[in-house]
Structures are given as structure tokens and as C-alpha cells.
Amino acid sequence: MIRYEKGRCRVLAKLLRPKTTVSAHCDLPCGVYDPAQARIEAESVKAIIEKYHANEDPVFRARAIGIKEQRSNLVKEHLWVLWTDYFKPPHFEKYPQLNQLFNEATKLAGAAGTKQSLDVKVAEDLLSKISEIDKIFWETKQA
């Protein structure tokens, strides 16, 4: 049986409490960001949709849909990292359309977009939004 004494618990809590609190903008602040990751996944989504329409095999089509949904999720994840970790308040001040672009792009990669749709036009719209984000991203890197 363990006996707790007030003084000893306070001492133990004090010993275990971190001495310094640190924070970072991401899980591992590597500083490597590039919209190309989202673009490559979005290009993959578009290619999968095109291949889906060109193939009548139901097994192939089922696999294509599963892979397309995974790739659509990866597009969203890469966009979210850029949106929440790379871009800072000064970027949003200089580019007021940036939040709207990210919102539209992540929706195009989500359930209302390429994740659920088999429309090549939706994938092209997603690539267009990523291209706009890419342009702004590289402008901020030059600054």
C-alpha cells in the first residue's frame, strides 16, 4: 500500500514539472514546405479519375476509387500544413485572398470535391487552386 504525504507529493510534482516550456510551429520544425507535395497528389487524383473512366473492370475501378480517396486526403493534409504552419499573419495581410484559396482548395480535395467526385473538371479546379497558392508561396519565399 502506498501512503501519500502532502509534502512528498509536492516535492515529487515539483521535480517532475518541466523547467522550460518550448513551442514550435509544427511537430518537427524542419522548415521544409512546398506546395509541390499537394500538386503531385492532386495530379495523381486527376490521373486516377481519367484511368477510372478508361477502364471497365470493376475490380480496377474499386481500387482506383480507394486510392483516389487516399490521395485526396493527402492533398488536404499538405495544404493544411502550408495553411497552418508556413503562412503567418503578415502573409495573410499581404494576400487577403489566401484564406479563401485554402478553404476552396481543401473543399475541392474533400468530400464535396475529388474525394467523392469522379469528375475530371473537379480535379482540374483543384489543381488550379493549388497553382494559385503555389504562386503566392514562392512570392513569399522571395521576400
PLM regions and their residue ranges:
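N-terminal intrinsically disordered, cationic/polar leader segments
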Residues: I2-R61, H91, P96-E132, I136, ...
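Alpha-helical segments in soluble extracytoplasmic regions
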Residues: R61-L79
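A ubiquitous, low-specificity "background" feature that marks scattered single residues
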Residues: V75-E77, L82, G110, T140
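Short, solvent-exposed, charged loop/turn and helix-capping segments
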Residues: H78-Y95
